[in-house]
């Protein structure tokens, strides 16, 4: 179809329907066509623009321009993929169909659910009204990451608060990445001593994989950061520059405290799209219920999960998606051939923690928090800050994303297969 687009004004049938044009959706469409070029594939998403979201941390740190993280969606899709510019209202798994918001229906043989998660900005009272002004920002939005960098450059003294909500969130390290790059700038511009930095984390640990905590803690100490655990942001008054937190003490008692700020970087509350549970596809928490290894739905054998929407315990990162894509693609090809899924995802995720401009602690791990480095120690020690990891984040990974991953060129993505 022209310009990789399709009209959904009538009932349509495809071999594979993919919900979501994010990293997973675009990449798996390409990977499937690499394996079977005759597949009829539809990608359901109204988005005309696609973003390299891992780059927004670098935008907020003054390393990337926002524009460099953006492409037009249709330019990334294989011409054999039909994009349907509609939102999903509900999946009818027993009918093998997807109902769209314009009332039309798309039928499928295999369905890939990769709609991502929902950023609930309204969950924090007063946040929406003050975002992008009054010193309140977030690297979790394309249009706000440049404001983060603007604030970092303008802030010479005062109070800077960085927040992290309850898990799960996209890239659990992102809230502290913003902190590190900001603090590094202030240190190098001789104003860090005049800025009181506080990291307010709704959780109880600095990072979920113990092997990396020591290295990260050393940077928190270097920058003089006050670590406030079990502090959950609930309300903001941008005009008076006050933020309220729910604090849970060691005995489980809750109290509310107010903090003044000059700069506030907020990580929003994150949740699954509502249509997942409304379609009967979710677990009790609302996330897509899948087998953690095959990524096949726990009830419907022709439905597959990919990316942030799943209830798997891996880190919700682009690196995880890069490893998940070939698993889903291989297993769909097997399913269409009447075979059981054999490709397995091991829970791999990666979080390049930008502890300073020019150095990164490259956290890589699988299910259970098992450290899973991609490189030998003589080349890169993942638990320590290295220049190589910075080069990967700032140069190599964006290139791999745009020119390989989204095009179905699978680099370092070998997935184990179950032996017969």
Map each language-model feature to its residues.
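FAD-binding beta-loop-beta segment adjacent to the flavin cofactor pocket
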Residues: 286-304, 355-375
């Amino acid at each position: 179809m022209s310009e990789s687009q399709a009209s959904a004004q009538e009932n349509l049938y495809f071999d594979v329907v993919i919900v979501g044009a994010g990293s997973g959706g675009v990449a798996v469409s390409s990977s499937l066509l690499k394996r079977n070029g005759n597949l009829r594939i539809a990608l359901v998403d109204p988005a005309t623009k696609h973003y390299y979201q891992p780059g927004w941390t670098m935008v907020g740190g003054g390393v990337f321009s926002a524009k460099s993280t953006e492409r037009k969606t249709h330019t990334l899709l294989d011409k054999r993929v039909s994009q349907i510019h509609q939102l999903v209202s509900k999946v009818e798994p027993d009918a093998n169909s997807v109902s769209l918001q314009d009332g039309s229906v798309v039928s499928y043989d295999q369905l890939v659910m990769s709609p991502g998660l929902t950023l609930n900005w309204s969950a924090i009272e007063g946040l929406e009204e003050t975002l992008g002004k009054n010193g309140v920002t977030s690297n979790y939005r394309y249009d706000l990451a440049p404001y983060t960098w603007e604030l970092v450059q303008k802030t010479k003294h005062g109070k800077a608060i960085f927040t992290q909500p309850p898990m799960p969130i996209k890239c659990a390290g992102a809230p502290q990445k913003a902190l590190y790059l900001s603090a590094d700038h202030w240190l190098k511009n001789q104003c860090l001593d005049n800025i009181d930095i506080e990291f307010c984390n709704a959780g109880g640990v600095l990072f979920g994989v113990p092997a990396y905590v020591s290295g990260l803690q050393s940077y928190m100490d270097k920058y003089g950061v006050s670590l406030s655990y079990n502090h959950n942001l609930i309300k903001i008054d941008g005009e008076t520059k006050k933020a309220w937190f729910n604090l849970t003490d060691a005995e489980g008692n809750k109290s509310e405290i107010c903090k003044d700020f000059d700069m506030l970087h907020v990580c929003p509350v994150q949740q699954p799209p509502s249509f997942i549970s409304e379609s009967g596809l979710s677990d009790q928490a609302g996330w897509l219920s899948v087998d953690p290894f095959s990524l096949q739905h726990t009830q419907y054998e022709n439905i597959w999960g990919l990316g942030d929407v799943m209830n798997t315990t891996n880190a919700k990162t682009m690196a995880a998606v890069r490893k998940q894509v070939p698993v889903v693609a291989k297993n769909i090809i097997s399913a269409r051939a009447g075979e059981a899924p054999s490709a397995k995802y091991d829970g791999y995720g990666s979080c390049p923690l930008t502890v300073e401009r020019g150095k990164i602690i490259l956290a890589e791990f699988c299910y259970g928090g098992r450290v899973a480095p991609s490189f030998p120690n003589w080349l890169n020690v993942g638990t320590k800050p290295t220049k190589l990891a910075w080069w990967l984040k700032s140069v190599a990974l964006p290139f791999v994303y745009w020119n390989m991953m989204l095009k179905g060129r699978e680099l370092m993505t070998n997935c184990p297969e179950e032996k017969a």
